[in-house]
A protein has these predicted regions:
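Central/C-terminal regulatory/activation regions of fungal transcription factors
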Residues: 2-215
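Fungal-biased detection of long, low-complexity, Ser/Thr-
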Residues: 119-367
Length: 367
């Protein structure tokens, strides 16, 4: 934890010394925003809030240097989400009703930005005409550009962490008891969070093929992109990193690992704050320095309690491909972290069967 705090404090101090004067040029603004991104990932992994110094400085960026649109607007809700998680972690938020309200509000602020997107920011559903190992399943999403895809995935990653925290807190309230010890409202929140967690993870995975060059927006335009569903052939595969053989322990863990999709089980604790991670904080600093936009989203999905063994293996293989093609050490390190993930404790399927059904009207059509 000390490594994280030193990293965040040092970055904030550097930005404070430069002051608003760094915003006189586009280059200065760009460097500051890159710093904010690095600190953001560090804060996410360490459970720290975004330094107020950086938040205040960002608000002083002149309007002519602000990008505007969802990519700009999403930052403040993300910072708020980090603060909520920190307040829960430190006990500032300790009453269950207040915790649920704060987490729900933070998620809704993020969701509202994406519910009112212009058409130019929405992704297309693409059906592959032939199997491709770089696509999990038969469909993927194609975005107008990298900025759109990255913005969607950053928001999804934060929403996954909020959902994990919601599940953790509600499960801790249940303990060894019955789910009916929760109020109807809280049981609905639990059911919605479990469903949303799966939807968000699937959406991130569906964005991966475009990041790896399997499909592009040109394919959508060339194959009749006016509609939402488009069938396109996959591009020639450049290379594929072979998956290392699973150890006996890994095979056993894979066979026994519960999944939200097939068993309905869920974790009692947020897997992104495991003890093993705190013991290897220096390795997680790789995430803060990752300059390939899909590495952190793949990490979040792979560590999610809703991630199936199949999806986690897909994430590991894609990270290995990124490492092989780009030599980015961060991709190799994160792949190793996912390979070493231990399944969290879970609730029984019987308890989950008592959860109310999630009304589709309460879920967004696009996440």
């Amino acid at each position: 934890m000390r490594a994280w705090q030193d990293h965040v404090s040092g970055a904030a101090a550097l930005a404070r010394m430069r002051g608003p004067g760094q915003f006189r040029t586009k280059a200065g603004v760009r460097m500051f925003l890159m710093l904010c991104h690095t600190v953001l990932i560090s804060c996410i992994q360490s459970g720290l809030p975004m330094p107020q110094t950086l938040i205040d400085l960002r608000r002083e960026i002149p309007a002519e240097h602000q990008s505007g649109g969802p990519a700009w607007l999403v930052a403040e809700p993300i910072y708020r989400a980090l603060q909520v998680r920190y307040d829960i972690k430190t006990g500032k938020l300790a009453i269950l009703d207040e915790i649920v309200e704060a987490l729900s509000s933070a998620d809704e602020r993020l969701a509202s930005i994406f519910s009112e997107l212009p058409e130019s920011w929405k992704y297309h559903h693409v059906q592959m005409t032939q199997p491709d190992a770089r696509v999990l399943g038969e469909t993927c999403h194609v975005y107008p550009g990298l900025i759109e895809s990255t913005t969607w995935n950053v928001a999804r990653g934060i929403r996954i962490l909020l959902a994990e925290t919601m599940i953790e807190q509600l499960c801790l309230a249940v303990g060894e008891g019955d789910l009916y010890t929760l109020s109807d409202c809280h049981r609905r929140s639990l059911a919605k969070s479990i469903t949303l967690l799966d939807m968000l993870g699937r959406a991130i995975i569906a964005s991966v093929p475009q990041h790896l060059g399997v499909v592009s927006i040109r394919d959508v335009q060339n194959f009749g992109g006016e509609g939402h569903a488009v069938a396109v052939p996959a591009k020639k595969q450049i290379c594929r990193a072979p998956s290392p053989p699973l150890t006996h322990e890994a095979r056993a863990r894979s066979r026994s690992e519960p999944t939200a999709r097939t068993t309905g089980c869920l974790p009692l604790f947020d897997p992104t704050r495991s003890k093993a991670q705190n013991d290897k904080a220096e390795r997680f600093m790789s995430l803060a320095g990752a300059n390939h936009t899909i590495i952190w989203p793949l990490y979040v999905v792979g560590m999610s309690s809703a991630c199936t063994p199949e999806t986690r293996q897909y994430a590991i293989e894609r990270l290995q491909v990124i490492h092989k093609e780009t030599a980015l050490e961060q991709a190799r390190v994160v792949a190793g972290l996912l390979q070493g993930k231990v399944a969290p404790p879970t609730l029984s399927t019987e308890l989950l069967d008592e959860l109310p059904a999630v009304e589709m009207g309460t879920l967004p059509t696009m996440v």
